[in-house]
From Swiss-Prot:
UniProt cross-references to InterPro entries, sorted A to Z: DNA-binding_RecF, DNA-binding_RecF_CS, P-loop_NTPase, RecF/RecN/SMC_N, RecF_2
Functional note: The RecF protein is involved in DNA metabolism; it is required for DNA replication and normal SOS inducibility. RecF binds preferentially to single-stranded, linear DNA. It also seems to bind ATP.
Protein family per UniProt: Belongs to the RecF family.
Residues reported to bind ATP: 30-37
Signal peptide coordinates: none
Pfam families (UniProt xref): SMC_N
This protein's name: DNA replication and repair protein RecF
Coiled coil: none
PANTHER family hit by this protein: DNA REPLICATION AND REPAIR PROTEIN RECF
Keywords: ATP-binding, Cytoplasm, DNA damage, DNA repair, DNA replication, DNA-binding, Nucleotide-binding, SOS response
Chief localization: cytoplasm
Length: 378
């Protein structure tokens, strides 16, 4: 899989851009603030319908413009697809596939598959659980695009249920009882969607575990006992060879929701479910978040991305690799090892502030990015 063309209209700093791309290594070099990361962000948006830098879409639209457009031509084997996304702040975004409208933007998910390496990746190790949950969920959708609907349904139910809890809590504090007649219904939805999401995450962690350990050794250049464990907010149900895992987890979530209801009403929050889960990362038995050195943390963050890359390749979904200013964060040894590991990919896009940050192992087409223009280097 690779991109052959990227077109932008009023996306971030670009009034307009048409960029022809090819397989292999593509390097984008330019000083900070010239628009390199905006290109990576646009490509990632086509793959995930989200930015890795901001949570809302409004900042993606160039100041003064009413909307932004991102077009990408994707080649996979002997097939090509043209994806167009229109980003409209305050309104529903629109999508086209091969110039024909599709009912929902998420219908184009899966056409482009990417793995992004970025300076923000250090937060996968050192940051809050939300970043690690997002890492798992984005990979779930990349492998199984229908999981986007499960995530959307879970988020919708979570918001509705939490609103009901806040309303009930306010009523009780005012001396009333609060209307909880529909809470049982929302509990059922939350447990059902939550169990599907949780079991999918558990299966993903098991699939990733061997790759993370191997990638860590390859990047760090040293062996270490790397731990990779999913921590659910719900006690693990007892093993049952007859009942499916999803059914047992759904029952466990329901039971915890019942037990937590008084606290949830008091706090106005849903305290049970996969939105409260975490991924515990350890190095030599110690939590990486608190004990890993800077180098160990970077090796582990890169290992998560490399393991994702290999897992998608094993699924016959060769991803486009996006490396956004990541080499500047690494020492010389890790730069060289990472370059050797990603070089065989079908397409690799690398950004760097200076040419010296790009390892010699990554040779290919080079562009210079300056003041919103992207010019091929001679």
């Amino acid at each position: 899989m690779h991109l052959t063309h990227l077109s932008l209209v009023d996306f971030r700093s670009y009034p307009s851009l048409d960029l022809t791309l090819g397989p292999g290594v593509v390097t984008l070099v330019g000083r900070n603030g010239q628009g390199k990361t905006n290109l990576i962000e646009a490509i990632g948006y086509v793959a995930t319908l989200a930015s890795h830098r901001v949570s809302a879409d409004a900042p993606l639209v160039r100041q003064g413009a009413s909307h932004a457009v991102v077009r990408a031509r994707i080649v996979r084997g002997d097939r090509a697809a043209l994806v167009e996304l229109e980003i409209v702040p305050g309104r529903a975004n629109r999508a086209r596939l091969n110039r024909a409208p599709v009912p929902r933007p998420r219908d184009v998910l899966g056409l482009l598959c990417t793995v992004l390496f970025a300076p923000e990746d250090l937060a996968l190790v050192k940051g809050d659980p939300a970043g690690r949950r997002q890492f798992l969920d984005e990979l779930l959708v990349a492998r199984t695009p229908r999981m986007a609907a499960v995530l959307a349904d879970y988020d919708r139910v979570l918001k509705q249920r939490s609103t009901l809890l806040r309303t009930a809590g306010a009523a009780r504090r005012a001396g009333g009882k609060g209307d909880l007649r529909t809470l049982d219904v929302w509990d059922g939805y939350l447990a059902s969607y939550g169990a599907e999401l949780l079991t999918a995450r558990l299966a993903l962690v098991e699939a990733l575990r061997p790759g993370v350990a191997g990638a860590y050794a390859a990047v760090a250049g040293a062996q270490a006992a790397v731990g990779f464990e999913y921590r659910a907010s719900v006690p693990q149900p007892a093993p049952d060879p007859v009942r499916p895992d999803r059914e047992r987890w759904e029952e466990a979530i329901r039971a915890e929701l019942v037990a937590a209801r008084p606290r949830e009403i008091e706090r106005g929050q849903t305290l049970v479910g996969p939105h409260r889960d975490d991924l515990l990362l350890t190095v030599d038995g110690l939590p990486a978040r608190g004990y890993a050195s800077h180098g160990e943390s970077w090796s582990l963050a890169l290992a998560l991305r490399l393991a994702s890359f290999e897992l998608l390749r094993a699924d016959d979904r060769e991803p486009v690799l996006l490396l956004d200013d990541v080499f500047a964060e690494l020492d010389v040894q890790r730069r060289s090892r990472l370059a050797e590991l990603v070089a065989p990919a079908e397409q690799v896009l690398v950004t760097a502030a200076v040419e010296a940050d790009v390892p010699a192992e990554l040779t290919g087409t080079r562009y210079v990015v300056a003041a919103g223009e992207v010019l091929r280097a001679s």
